[in-house]
Amino acid sequence: GAGVTVDGLTIKDTGFDEPVKVKGYTTTQINSLSGMGAGDMVYDSNLGTLKVYNGNSWNAMSDSTFTVTVDYLVIAGGGSGSTQHGGGGGAGGYRASYNNETSGGGSSSENSLTTTAGTNFTVTVGAGGAAVTGTGNGTIDNSNNGSNSVFSTISSTGGGGAGSYSGHAGLAGGSGGGGSTNTDGGAGTSGQGYDGGNAGAQNGSIYTSGGGGGAGAAGSTGQASKAGDGGAGVASTITGSSVTRAGGGGGGLYRGGNDAANSMIGSGGTGGGGNGSVTNSQNEFNAEEAGTANTGGGGGGHGGYSTTSGAGGSGVVILRYSSDYSITSGGGLTFTTATVGSDKVSTFTAGTGTCSFS
């Protein structure tokens, strides 16, 4: 428009076709500006707000903020296997929202989480359950559960520890730990994982155990001829390629003076579950294995008595969001960020701390 003149100063009527233009910068750029005077105004492109300089600092003029939609994969630490014909550890709880991919326990994909730029949220990567060592006199009750993993309001439950001699069942967890001779596997958590496998009864000098539950399948029952296998994990493409995680640990088997072979080992479930071990009075077949780090895999059980089981694998937290945003951490977390198509993917592999988007 033509505008009006007041005391020699022309104020232009821009109309709706000529909006007032304010210089836009990122938050980092604004904080680096120099030479400002009180009343200067800029647009913060990260937070979606107008800011005015008061002579000392920049202050937001409006309450409007940008919302960030985040897809996630949150896997807790896996439970450790046990010793003394111990079962396999259960996989860490598995919760997923990306691309309609399933969560653990056969449940549907969860909803994406929405947060606001500049708002802090917590990320915690759960540790795997610590290995246990048998004493040879039947005093080991159970191995150890894994620790929970957290993204904001989303929490996944640590995998269940396994049962051990004598008469100790598997523990409940994200996925349940496998039972020891003549006991049941632990229960998995609804929407996160499956139950651990049961263990068959003693057969002479043969003692068996069940496999740990996985995010994608229950652990199998242990037999006199073979320890139970760990349950399978679940595949996700949140990082841009398909990766299977959260497999249960294989069970351990003790066969006394009977023949033993590698074929009797309880195999770890696909997705990071550790293999178990078979032992007779002369030999050990395949030393037990730990669950794979950052998969939440369960640890393998051991057939022997004065032996050490497989530790559970640590968990992982993976976040996928628009590449328009960046994530920052206040410390205490180990993570990397990669660009995948039009998104960024941040993978947290250890620690706990607060983060925010900008």
Where on the chain are the PLM-derived regions?
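Extracellular beta-strand solenoids
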Residues: 1, 6-18, 22, 44, ...
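Short, solvent-exposed secondary-structure boundary motifs
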Residues: 1-2, 27-38, 225-228, 324-330
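Short beta-strand segments and strand-loop junctions that repeat across beta-rich extracellular domains
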Residues: 48-56
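Tryptophan-rich substrate-binding surfaces of secreted polymer-degrading and adhesive proteins
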Residues: 56-64
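Low-complexity, glycine/proline-biased repetitive segments and flexible coils/loops
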Residues: 69-358
